[in-house]
A protein has these predicted regions:
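Non-catalytic positions within long, well-ordered alpha-helices that form the structural scaffold/packing
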Residues: 99-102, 193, 212
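Generic non-transmembrane alpha-helical segments
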Residues: 11, 15, 154, 158-168, ...
Length: 267
């Protein structure tokens, strides 16, 4: 990151005369959801002074600002991961940018692996708590974090109602953050399951922490795109993750649209 946050915010505001109340971070293979934004103004990351570029397939690298069902929104298509070599400051930069743009509600989406056989690929899961399985801070056994400032009960309620309204099966569970970029071993998946995890992925928790510190209301929804290692015998590929996310895209998009339409009910 070479530019100042103030410069980045000023540039985005100069490109789009929108003061978004809600931000959505789109995970692997979910970038097409930005097409639902009405009057969407696209701001490529490469145009923002000093803003980094994502390197992972399925992350296009642009902000989309506009309206969705009457709610002013900004969507980020493309995120940054520690395994790409970025530091935490860069990984959480979009969250800080959203905050400076006036965002109050943050919806994080991701593609994750299912650690439980009953949650098959294509399952949508609202995250009620998280585990830090990276061991970056210490070697203690990870603990489940379910504080409301990281996982808004109000937004989880709206997500559940939106799923019911649209006849979408939305599970709830605990997301385990692993460092990546290699997929986890069967032994690691067994431990995550024992610790109470339901899904595992390589992103999102740094964003949850940053947004929580900034006072945003946070909702995280995972698309379980594959079984994690050892749950079934088939190997895992990134291509499978992107394909599964695309297949679930219609349901996911419908759910997100409904959530955003009703998100003002928590304010």
């Amino acid at each position: 990151m070479t530019g100042s946050l103030e410069t980045m915010v000023s540039y985005v505001k100069s490109r789009a005369n929108v003061s978004p109340a809600t931000a959505v971070v789109l995970g692997s293979g979910l970038g097409h959801m930005a097409e639902n934004v009405e009057g969407g103004i696209k701001v490529p990351y490469g145009d923002i002074p000093g803003y980094p570029q994502p390197t992972v397939e399925g992350h296009s690298g642009e902000l989309i600002l506009g309206n969705l069902r009457g709610e002013k929104v900004v969507m980020a298509s493309g995120r940054f991961h520690l395994y790409e070599g970025w530091d935490l400051e860069t990984v959480t930069l979009p969250i800080k940018l959203f905050h400076e743009l006036g965002v109050k509600n943050l919806i994080l989406t991701n593609s994750a692996g299912s650690v439980r056989v009953q949650n098959s690929p294509g399952t949508l899961m609202a995250i009620t708590a998280h585990l830090d399985f990276t061991y970056q801070e210490n070697s203690d056994t990870p603990l489940i974090v379910n504080e409301d400032r990281y996982h808004s009960a109000g937004l989880l309620h709206i997500a559940g109602e939106s799923a019911e309204r649209n006849n979408i099966d939305l599970k709830e569970g605990v997301y385990a953050w692993a460092l990546g970029p290699s997929y986890e071993t069967p032994a690691e998946i067994d431990l995550i399951r024992e610790l109470g995890g339901h899904a595992v992925g390589m992103s999102t928790v740094p964003e949850i922490r940053a947004a929580g510190e900034l006072g945003m209301k946070i909702l995280t929804i995972s698309c379980l795109t594959n079984y994690a290692a050892g749950v079934v015998e088939a190997p895992i590929t990134h291509e499978e993750v992107i394909a599964s996310a695309a297949e679930a895209g219609e349901r996911f998009g419908k759910l997100l649209t409904s959530i955003i339409e009703h998100i003002g009910e928590t304010e």
